[in-house]
């Protein structure tokens, strides 16, 4: 829970500076940048922190494709876009998942229709953003990135690539 409190505090002041934008331009092509910048600035900041942390972790390992690692770190949450969740909405969804996981999964919906449509959609995106982002990347022709993004919240397996393992670790630290 301490990590979630820190994430909330970071989100309150989330912004990107020119160095961050240059980093994104260095690693992502135009279409990929479109997906990155379609995210809320809070998610952009999180993705950048995840990428920077992943690079630090990679320096302690051998055989890591650091360019690919940075790319998947920057793109891992592109299934969430501006308007899906406000900061307070994210807090509410995290709390619902923590304390009422069966209820929140059962009521998650792609549709925004109905009295609670916004919240049902927010829950859906929370639970399925890896698959949503993976499909967006696949449509851009980024099949290798799509396959890793799809799995970044899945349970670890013995066959997971080093890059996927490092992404999960960096994501959990940010």
Question: Where are each of the predicted segments found?
Answer:
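Divalent metal-dependent catalytic cores for phosphoryl transfer on phosphate-bearing substrates
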Residues: 33-174
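Non-catalytic interface/linker regions that flank or bridge core catalytic/transmembrane domains
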Residues: 1-35, 155-156, 174
């Amino acid at each position: 829970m301490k990590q979630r409190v820190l994430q909330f505090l970071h989100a309150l002041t989330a912004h990107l500076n020119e160095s961050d934008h240059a980093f994104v331009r260095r690693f992502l092509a135009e279409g990929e940048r479109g997906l990155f910048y379609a995210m809320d600035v809070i998610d952009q900041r999180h993705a950048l922190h995840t990428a920077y942390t992943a690079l630090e972790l990679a320096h302690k390992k051998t055989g890591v494709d650091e360019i690919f690692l940075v790319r998947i770190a920057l793109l891992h949450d592109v299934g969430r876009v501006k308007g899906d969740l406000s900061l307070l909405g994210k807090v509410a969804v995290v709390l619902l998942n923590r304390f009422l996981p069966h209820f929140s999964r059962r009521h998650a919906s792609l549709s925004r229709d109905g009295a609670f449509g916004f919240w049902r959609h927010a829950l859906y995106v929370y639970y399925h953003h890896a698959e949503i982002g993976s499909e967006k990347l696949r449509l851009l022709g980024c099949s290798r990135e799509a396959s890793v993004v799809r799995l970044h919240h899945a349970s670890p397996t013995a066959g997971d690539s080093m890059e996927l393992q490092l992404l999960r670790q960096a994501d959990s630290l940010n």
